[in-house]
Amino acid sequence: AIHDSIIPGAVLCVVENGDISYLQAYGNRAVVPAQETMTTNTIFDFFSVSKPTGAVSAALLLCAEGKLNVNDYVSQYIPQYHSDVQIRHLMTHYSGLPAYMTAARLDSIYLARGTKMSRPAFTIDTIARCKRPSAVGEKYRYSCLNFISLQKVVEAIIGEDINTYMRNKLYRPLGNNTMGWLPADSLLDRIAPTECIDEVCIIGDVHDPLARIMMTGVSGNAGVFATA
């Protein structure tokens, strides 16, 4: 992929029985506006890997503590939510929800209504009331909205934002002090850019527009940053 210029670089990490047996950086982490060599401590936007490493992991931690059950209805935690959707439907993409909602359309509606709700609150309220293309359990449809919903379930239980919870509950105890949403400015020189348009690069901000604009960077569908 690097040779064919599909990606500028990568980091390969092999873990066996809990120990790193191989760790190597290849190529470059940036080529615009200047070339930067890839390093093993480069931090990446995890894109949709944020779903299992973020929202799902948080939900499973709560399940292990007896605070959440996959058969619970989402409406127990988000009262206005579709009444027939269970936690397991969110986790397995069988909620019937649309695949996505564009940030541009959501934000235009948000601004037009002049609501006092925050953008994240408006987003989950819109998801909770939206028209679904299929019935719950009827059809598998990969949906970012499932995991924004799961995030909000988690936050309703823990009483804090998922970023703070996961940093303290999982990432830092595992020794990964750089993992989480909204990476610190002090880490910017280690973060690989995700996209560059006219030599202006997205670095340290989640690439997904719905997560970046409507969820302000902390979202169940995207936004986790970490090393390999």
Range-by-range predicted roles:
Residues 16, 74, 78, 182-188:
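Short, solvent-exposed turn/loop segments enriched in Gly/Ser/Thr/Pro and often Arg
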Residues 4-11, 33-90, 134-145, 219-222:
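Short active-site loop at a secondary-structure junction
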Residues 85-228:
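Short, surface-exposed loop or secondary-structure junction motifs
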Residues 29, 38, 65-68, 107, ...:
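Amphipathic, positively biased hydrophobic alpha-helical segments used for protein targeting
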Residues 1-44, 67-71, 125-129, 202, ...:
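Short, conserved catalytic-motif segment at the N-terminal edge
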Residues 16-17, 58-61, 169:
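Residue-level detector of alpha-helical secondary structure
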Residues 2, 62, 154-157:
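Hydrophobic pocket-lining residues that define ligand/cofactor binding sites across diverse proteins
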